[in-house]
């Protein structure tokens, strides 16, 4: 996965240019900004900082992390409100526990779909540790839309779905990409968070909750 995204760093944001998705993209962006306004945000898997760039002006502060240096190189070349955004090369699993009040929100865009179903519960527990209990978690991701989404190549025994994607060098690679239903999200999140809210339009979904 790291090599896949390293190759895509310069072209990753093309996925946001699909004409049929623009209205839904604006809608989901507005909702993200509403939730993250005045928050001290930890962003995991920030990638090229497409979303960082958009919510940083309304957030109180942002610490944006990713484990892929080519992605961070693109991210750090952008312009942000002075003094608001810090970047760190870090794997989510290596992030230190938050100090009291360090963060009030955690944001992850198009990350949850790349987490194996068997790993999701432990990941939520880890997020609570690195951001602090009572932190608002905000996730956004893709819906599967026939004719717009890359087709699903296979499904494993645990229900994880995979796509075949073309690399910049012309090779093809299998990528985990899950498309959870509302009921699946509530079942997974329910035992470890509170105040779950889910929004969907045609192309995207958004989940907010409070980490226990």
Q: Model-flagged regions — what are they?
A:
Residues 46-94:
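Class I SAM-dependent methyltransferase SAM/SAH-binding core
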Residues 48, 174-212:
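Conserved Class I S-adenosyl-L-methionine
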Residues 94-100:
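Short conserved loop adjoining the S-adenosyl-L-methionine
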Residues 121-133:
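A short glycine-rich, Lys/Arg-flanked "PGG" loop and its adjoining helix->strand segment in the class I
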Residues 140-189:
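C-terminal alpha-helical "lid/dimerization" subdomain adjacent to the S-adenosyl-L-methionine
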